[in-house]
Amino acid sequence: MKIGIIGAMEEEVTLLRDKIENRQTITIGGSEIYT
């Protein structure tokens, strides 16, 4: 199952991003995408 989350504040994104296992970061159009 895939879930997409959009966060407006860096603090929100950081809390969720740190909990993602096996995370990869991709930059598309200046935006960071975490998979």
Curated annotation (Swiss-Prot):
Which superkingdom does the taxonomy of this entry point to?
A: Bacteria
> Reaction catalysed?
S-adenosyl-L-homocysteine + H2O = S-(5-deoxy-D-ribos-5-yl)-L-homocysteine + adenine; S-methyl-5'-thioadenosine + H2O = 5-(methylsulfanyl)-D-ribose + adenine; 5'-deoxyadenosine + H2O = 5-deoxy-D-ribose + adenine
- Residue positions of the active site: E12
GO molecular function per UniProt:
adenosylhomocysteine nucleosidase activity; methylthioadenosine nucleosidase activity
Q: Which GO terms describe its biological process?
A: L-methionine salvage from methylthioadenosine
Give the stretches traversing the membrane.
Answer: none
Which UniProt keywords are given for this protein, alphabetically ordered?
Amino-acid biosynthesis, Hydrolase, Methionine biosynthesis
Q: Give the record's pathway.
A: Amino-acid biosynthesis; L-methionine biosynthesis via salvage pathway; S-methyl-5-thio-alpha-D-ribose 1-phosphate from S-methyl-5'-thioadenosine (hydrolase route): step 1/2
EC number(s) in its UniProt entry? 3.2.2.9
Family to which this protein belongs = Belongs to the PNP/UDP phosphorylase family. MtnN subfamily.
Q: What does this protein do?
A: Catalyzes the irreversible cleavage of the glycosidic bond in both 5'-methylthioadenosine (MTA) and S-adenosylhomocysteine (SAH/AdoHcy) to adenine and the corresponding thioribose, 5'-methylthioribose and S-ribosylhomocysteine, respectively. Also cleaves 5'-deoxyadenosine, a toxic by-product of radical S-adenosylmethionine (SAM) enzymes, into 5-deoxyribose and adenine. Thus, is required for in vivo function of the radical SAM enzymes biotin synthase and lipoic acid synthase, that are inhibited by 5'-deoxyadenosine accumulation.
- Subunit text: Homodimer.
Please state what the protein is called.
Answer: 5'-methylthioadenosine/S-adenosylhomocysteine nucleosidase
